[in-house]
């Protein structure tokens, strides 16, 4: 007897682990589409700095949840979940198998486990006080108030840092302890990549990022949205902005971006290990192993 619940395939892994390339190979083999679960790739014009699938890759396989919003519009995990769930249900209604790919742990789990966001409206006074303190001090505060949350976000991400503090100061509860509830009525096959050569891959990707246009991309974003756009404080863009300001050389920017990305990848791996139940793929033959596991789940 076939399972009554529809199957949703999930591929997770830290940044630069090769998710995009593997996902495209899997999607081609099974003739399915990709739903990108990435907190920055959802924004238009942010291509090189987010390692967004190329136009060639997007033409080869249909991608959803890419270039959905303008960089000036903040999309939080709850909003992302709502957008993604609509996209997934649309495919399920067409009798297709959705394929979710990404490294944003909180966003992915908000989709596959159900998300209950803290009912805390924006606190203007609190936010202004945190902004005056500066990101470095706010990050140190968050490490004390909600250490688990700091494992899931980039330490330069002012928006999520302040939101974490805001929730804690208003409710007295950690944002990381927010409950996942009402999981969707799907069967989830969760696959994971855990590369042993991740540091080398991160360095190579960062070097390519600066060689192939992140500085020009950052200039264009600044010209359109201003240099204070919060997304320009995230990894890669912040360093590119400092090259433009002549505060860093390109070599220094590459080194700093690489270091930050490695630190972020470590936090991603910790999150996946503690919060997810992935079947980790065999590094010697990722595609073959993934195909075997997906075919078994499909029955």
UniProtKB/Swiss-Prot annotation:
Cofactor: Mg(2+)
Spans annotated as Interaction with substrate tRNA: 38-41
Residues at which substrate binds: 15-20
tRNA processing recorded as keyword: yes
Site (Interaction with substrate tRNA) residue list: 104
Binding site for ATP: 13-20
Disulphide-bonded residues: none
Keyword Nucleotide-binding: yes
Keywords of the record: ATP-binding, Magnesium, Nucleotide-binding, Transferase, tRNA processing
Entry's EC annotation: 2.5.1.75
Catalytic activity: adenosine(37) in tRNA + dimethylallyl diphosphate = N(6)-dimethylallyladenosine(37) in tRNA + diphosphate
GO MF annotation terms: ATP binding; tRNA dimethylallyltransferase activity
Pfam families according to UniProt: IPPT
An example Gene Ontology biological process: tRNA modification
Assembly and oligomerization: Monomer.
Protein family: Belongs to the IPP transferase family.
UniProt name for this protein: tRNA dimethylallyltransferase
Source organism per UniProt: Prochlorococcus marinus (strain MIT 9515)
């Amino acid at each position: 007897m076939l399972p009554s619940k529809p199957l949703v395939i999930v591929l997770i892994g830290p940044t630069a682990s090769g998710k995009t390339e593997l996902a495209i190979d899997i999607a081609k083999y099974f003739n399915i589409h990709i739903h990108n679960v990435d907190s920055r790739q959802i924004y238009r014009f942010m291509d090189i700095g987010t390692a967004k699938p190329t136009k060639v890759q997007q033409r080869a396989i249909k991608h959803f949840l890419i270039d959905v919003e303008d960089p000036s519009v903040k999309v939080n995990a709850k909003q992302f979940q709502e957008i993604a769930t609509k996209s997934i249900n649309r495919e399920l209604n067409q009798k297709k198998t959705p394929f979710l790919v990404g490294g944003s742990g909180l966003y992915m789990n908000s989709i596959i486990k159900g998300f209950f966001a803290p009912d805390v409206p924006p606190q203007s006074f609190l936010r202004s006080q945190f902004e005056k303190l500066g990101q470095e001090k706010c990050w140190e505060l968050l490490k004390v108030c909600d250490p688990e949350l700091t494992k899931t976000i980039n330490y330069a991400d002012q928006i999520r840092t302040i939101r974490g503090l805001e929730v804690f100061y208003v409710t007295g509860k950690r944002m990381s302890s927010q409950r996942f509830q009402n999981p969707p009525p799907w069967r989830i096959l969760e696959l994971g990549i855990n590369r042993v050569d991740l540091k080398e891959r991160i360095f190579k990707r960062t070097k390519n990022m600066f060689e192939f246009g992140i500085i020009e991309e950052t200039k264009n974003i600044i010209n359109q949205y201003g240099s204070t756009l919060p997304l320009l404080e995230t990894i890669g863009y912040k360093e590119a902005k400092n090259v433009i300001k002549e505060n860093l050389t390109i070599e220094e920017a590459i080194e700093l971006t690489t270091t930050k990305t490695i630190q972020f990848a470590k936090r991603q791996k910790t999150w996946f290990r503690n919060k997810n139940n992935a079947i980790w793929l065999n590094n010697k033959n990722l595609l073959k192993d993934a195909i075997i596991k997906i075919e078994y789940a499909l029955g």
